[in-house]
Structures are given as C-alpha cells and as structure tokens.
C-alpha cells in the first residue's frame, strides 16, 4: 500500500478514490488535487511513479 499524509491508501483502487481515504479529502477535493497535479483520475494507485 502507498502512504499519503500518514494514511495507507489502497493499491488496487483508482487514485481518485484512494485519496478519499485521507481524513478530510472528499471526491471533489481529490479531483481538484489530481487536476492540479496533472494526474489522470483513472490511474491505479499501484501504477503511480515518484515522478
């Protein structure tokens, strides 16, 4: 599992859903963060790179 803000987020879920496991991050916030970072909402957490 990946860790973000001290929270383990699931590898098999889409990143847009995985980010909602962080307290205070809902679906809309997750979408805004990904758009600002230029990351596709459809990518799986396990497929992310450190770039």
UniProtKB/Swiss-Prot annotation:
A GO molecular-function annotation: structural constituent of ribosome
Cysteine pairs bridged by disulfides in the record: none
Chain segments annotated as coiled-coil in the UniProt record: none
Keywords attached to this entry: Ribonucleoprotein, Ribosomal protein, RNA-binding, rRNA-binding, tRNA-binding
Cellular component terms per the entry's GO annotation: ribonucleoprotein complex; ribosome
Alphabetical list of InterPro entries matching this protein: Ribosomal_uS13, Ribosomal_uS13-like_H2TH
A Gene Ontology biological process term: translation
Pfam families: Ribosomal_S13
Self-association state and partner proteins as the record states: Part of the 30S ribosomal subunit. Forms a loose heterodimer with protein S19. Forms two bridges to the 50S subunit in the 70S ribosome.
Annotated protein name in UniProt: Small ribosomal subunit protein uS13
Gene symbol of the encoding locus: rpsM
